């Protein structure tokens, strides 16, 4: 008696595995690029949130001065995740300069730089900054934080 069972041959299974591998090779880089773009969008949005929170802080509890991320978080002006200075693959920093009566107004600048700057797990390809004027700046020339407010302002302005 012949025992004939229906099923897939080894060749057919290998062909299916090869096709899945080809599809994955095409899809994965696109997914990683989408993730980087989402991280960059989140970083820009977070910087705009910081800018808005700084205005509220200065007008309410800052006595004319701006606050640090920790101070903004303590007043519930920004997301608690953002007060840890790390969100969506970016590291954030905020540097206020206090008001000096009769000499200079209070200012601040905030920056966002990618946590991972190279390789497959790269979290972003650009750094961003925003200052007291509210204009978003960004570039990919260096993936380190801007040194000061003048460096933020000197960077190319993004479509605001």
Where are these regions (language model features)?
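A short acidic/small-residue loop/turn micro-motif
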Residues: 142-146
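N-terminal single-pass transmembrane signal-anchor helix
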Residues: 2-31
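Alpha-helix termini
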Residues: 20, 34-38, 147
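Extracellular/periplasmic head regions of type IV pilus-like filament subunits
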Residues: 52-126, 130-133, 140, 151-160
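Conserved hydrophobic/amphipathic alpha-helical signal-anchor segments
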Residues: 6, 25, 30-78
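Short, flexible coil/turn micro-motifs enriched in small/turn-prone residues
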Residues: 2, 13-16, 36, 84, ...
């Amino acid at each position: 008696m012949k025992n004939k069972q229906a099923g897939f041959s080894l060749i057919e299974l290998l062909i299916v595995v090869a096709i899945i591998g080809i599809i994955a090779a095409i899809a994965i880089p696109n997914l990683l690029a989408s993730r980087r773009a989402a991280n960059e969008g989140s970083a820009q949005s977070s910087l705009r949130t910081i800018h808005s929170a700084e205005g509220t802080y200065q007008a309410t509890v800052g006595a004319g001065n701006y606050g640090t991320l920790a101070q903004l978080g303590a007043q519930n002006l920004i997301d608690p995740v953002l007060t840890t200075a790390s969100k969506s693959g970016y590291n954030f920093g905020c540097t206020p300069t206090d008001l000096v009566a009769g000499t200079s107004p209070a200012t601040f600048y905030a920056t966002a730089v990618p946590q991972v700057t190279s390789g497959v797990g790269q979290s972003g390809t650009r750094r961003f900054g925003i200052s007291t004027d509210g204009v978003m700046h960004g570039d990919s020339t260096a993936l380190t934080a801007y040194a000061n407010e003048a460096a933020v302002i000197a960077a190319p302005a993004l479509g605001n």
